[in-house]
A protein has these predicted regions:
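Conserved ABC ATPase signature
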Residues: 1-5, 9
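Hydrophobic anchor residue at the start of the ABC signature
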Residues: 15
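Conserved catalytic motifs of ABC-family nucleotide-binding domains
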Residues: 22
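Catalytic Walker B motif of ABC-type/P-loop ATPase nucleotide-binding domains
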Residues: 26-29
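Helical segment within the ABC ATPase nucleotide-binding domain
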Residues: 41-53
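Regulatory nucleotide-sensing modules
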Residues: 89-147, 153-155
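A small-molecule sensor/coupling module
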Residues: 97-100, 168-170, 187-218
Length: 218
């Protein structure tokens, strides 16, 4: 009798029907909608089991607790795709700002060990790493190079100088492999950060951590 079957059980039955033909791909539209936490967790555990078997699960959801458990997130705003690196690097931004950045960001490729930012140079962009690694390098009193940080895809740099002013405090260069970055012009970065206090606070904490790292290296 349908009335004796819980919403969670109905959802499990629907998934079982969908998987009966052993498809390589399952598209689930709000699979945990209207479910309690326990039932929703069962659904996600089931999906994780399918993924372990080599299947692909595509979920449409507005639930942040689900997106935190996925391998990849794609955000759509007003029918347009937001660049994944922007959403990973600046997750606190409003979606409209993410979409704006997606449209104006510049893509650059740097070869291994190529300088991206020179110490004491001007910083005109906020950089987000799309692929590869970059090294943040300082020189000690004997002019020896000291790599104080190695940043990877989804991380950013250039924010210290853009927010605090002044010249670059370190050399930033590509790692051992080519690096792909997204570069956001200074004016656009500052304007949007001023409109997003939560993002400004999050970046501010990272700025302080990096300044502390520099002091330790000195």
């Amino acid at each position: 009798i349908p009335v004796l079957v819980s919403t969670g059980q109905q959802q499990l039955a629907a998934i079982a029907r969908a998987m009966a033909c052993d498809p390589p791909l399952l598209v689930a539209d709000e699979p945990t909608g209207n479910l309690d936490t326990r039932s929703a967790d069962k659904i996600i555990q089931l999906f994780e089991g399918f993924v372990a078997q080599g299947k692909t699960i595509v979920m449409v959801t507005h639930d942040p607790s689900l997106t935190s458990r996925t391998h990849r997130n794609i955000i759509i705003s007003d029918g347009e795709l937001i660049n994944e690196i922007i959403s990973r690097s600046l997750p606190q931004l409003r979606h409209r700002h993410m979409l704006e950045f997606t449209k104006i960001v510049e893509e650059h490729i740097y070869q291994p060990h190529e300088t991206i930012i020179s110490r004491d140079g001007n910083v005109d962009y906020f950089f987000m790493i799309r692929k590869g690694e970059v090294d943040v390098v300082l020189l000690d009193n004997q002019k020896n190079e000291n790599v104080i940080s190695r940043l990877q895809a989804g991380e950013f740099f250039g924010e210290i100088e853009l927010l605090r002013g002044g010249k670059s405090i370190a050399n930033v260069r590509a790692g051992d492999q080519p690096v792909e970055v997204l570069a956001l012009p200074r004016a656009d970065f500052i304007r949007v950060i001023n409109e997003s206090p939560i993002t400004a606070e999050a970046i501010g904490k990272i700025v302080q951590t990096r300044l502390d790292e520099r002091q330790i290296s000195d």
